[in-house]
Each structure stands twice: as C-alpha cells, then as structure tokens.
Amino acid sequence: MVKIGNVEVNKKVVLAPMAGISNSAFRRICKSMGADLVYAEMVSDKAIYYNNKKTIDMLYMTDEERPIAQQIFGSDVDSFVVAAKYIEETMHPDIIDINMGCPVPKVALKAQAGSALLKNPAKIKEIVKAVVKAVNCPVTVKIRSGWDENSINAVVVAKTNEEAGASAITIHARTRSQGYSGKADYNIIKQVKEAVNIPVIGNGDVFTAEDALK
C-alpha cells in the first residue's frame, strides 16, 4: 500500500491520463480490470478559467472511479489556482495532478505549458506551492526526464516539486524532444525515486502486463 497524501493506493496499478482516451467510461473499464488509482485526461487551466463548456464536460467522473486524479495543464499561476479550486469544489477528485510532461507542440511550444515548465524550476515551485495552498486534496505532478538530452533534470525537478508540497511524482522516462520515440530510460526513474521521499510512479513503455511487472 502506498499513501499519496491522505489517499491510499492499495495496488501498484495506475491508469495514465491519456488525452482523448482516459474518459469516464474508459476509466471504469480499467477499474473493473484491476486498476486502483486512475487519472483523468488533462484539461486546460485557461479553458476552465473561461468556463469552456467542452472542457467542463470533460471533468465528469463517478464515485466508482475513486480514487481518481484530475490532471491540469497550463503555465499561469493564477489560472492554475482558479482551475484547481473549481475542480475540487465541483468534482471532488481525490487528487489534483499538474502536467509538466506533455511534449506536443500545441502545449509545450505554443502554450509554454506541459514539458516546457521543465526549463523553469522556479516557476514550477511557484505553481505547485500555489495549487497546494489553494486545495485540500493532495497535489501530484507528472514530469519527463528533461527538455532534451542536453538538459536531463528530472532529479532537480522532482526535488523542487517535493519542496513545493507535491505528494507524489509521476515520471515519463523520456525527454520532451523524444516525444514517444526511442525507449524510456528506467534508470532515470530509479534516480528520481532515490532522490525524493514521496511516492514515485514510473511511466513509459508499459504495453503488456510483463512490462508493468518490471
């Protein structure tokens, strides 16, 4: 059993927040197959800030999905706080998760969100501290190994998040520049796990049950 803040995770089977896939129906299917903690697909802090109906509809969740985490992406501290508070007050997820790993150009380059935050640990600390202060539920963070092969900083980023009050770290062991190509470097996950005192969830290249058991 692992504790993420006050949330007990009894199995080491966690559903990732896959954009366009991890909706309520899919999450319930995964729950029936043995997933314990499930993550809802990411939503934009700005879209919630401006009350975008399509985004608000994406927040739908049911009690049978618990424990459940709702992931948010963005780059503005105030928008993150507004979105996190709205989600907690309306949907009551067990966990709020902050996306610092999405590599797609629309998010990382245009919006300077997702994995773009890896380049700015000071801003990471500011965002996480503000969200932790704004909500009552645990706050977790999803990161990558780094922006590119010349800036592998997962350990620094993980420590920064822990210092800011994050209750757990998920790391996709690829860089932003890799996207979903190449292979995940599980040694990076090991380094992060050894560097922090909060739970670390490994992510990347889990295609089969055998992969998960590794």
Spans of model-derived segments:
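Flavin-dependent oxidoreductase catalytic cores
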Residues: 1-214
